[in-house]
Curated annotation (Swiss-Prot):
Oligomeric form and interacting partners: Part of the 30S ribosomal subunit. Forms a loose heterodimer with protein S19. Forms two bridges to the 50S subunit in the 70S ribosome.
Name by which UniProt lists this protein: Small ribosomal subunit protein uS13
A UniProt-annotated Pfam family: Ribosomal_S13
Function noted in UniProt: Located at the top of the head of the 30S subunit, it contacts several helices of the 16S rRNA. In the 70S ribosome it contacts the 23S rRNA (bridge B1a) and protein L5 of the 50S subunit (bridge B1b), connecting the 2 subunits; these bridges are implicated in subunit movement. Contacts the tRNAs in the A and P-sites.
GO cellular component terms, A-Z: cytosol; small ribosomal subunit
Disordered: region residues: 91-125
SUPFAM superfamilies: S13-like H2TH domain
Any one GO BP annotation for this protein: translation
HAMAP family xrefs: Ribosomal_uS13 (MF_01315)
Length: 125
């Protein structure tokens, strides 16, 4: 079953399968299923066409998912960088944005280590 251009795993429960769509977490998935009247513990393979269609329609009408959600996130980060606020500067420099320490950690955000040559010792005579 495809929703918002994503193939959902057929062997998983509906709540978990919906989280494979970018922009839908567990809470949103539970809300969607509750509003469409589908039990959260039903497998995706057990859903009929009408139920799948109701899920698709609800997501299309009321939620920003996949490309739309990613684009919105990129725009908000770009806005922070254009304004020149502290968070924007941290994004621009590829450093942690939320106040984490950077002296020893933050390798994921900073990338691979850039080796800096140490001070050479003078040769003794």
């Amino acid at each position: 079953m495809r929703i918002a251009g994503v193939n959902l795993p057929l062997n998983k429960h509906a709540v978990i399968a919906l989280t494979h769509v970018y922009g839908i977490g567990k809470t949103t998935a539970k809300t969607i299923l509750q509003r469409t009247g589908i039990a959260p513990d039903r497998k995706i393979s057990d859903l009929n066409d009408a139920e799948a269609h109701s899920i698709r329609e609800l997501i299309a009408e009321e939620y920003k998912v996949e490309g739309q959600a990613r684009g919105e996130q990129q725009l908000s980060i770009k806005r922070l960088m254009d304004v020149g606020c502290y968070r924007g500067l941290r994004h621009r420099r590829s450093l942690p944005v939320r106040g984490q320490n950077t002296q020893t950690n933050a390798r994921t955000r900073k990338g691979k280590r850039k080796t800096v040559a140490g001070k050479k010792k003078a040769a003794r005579k």
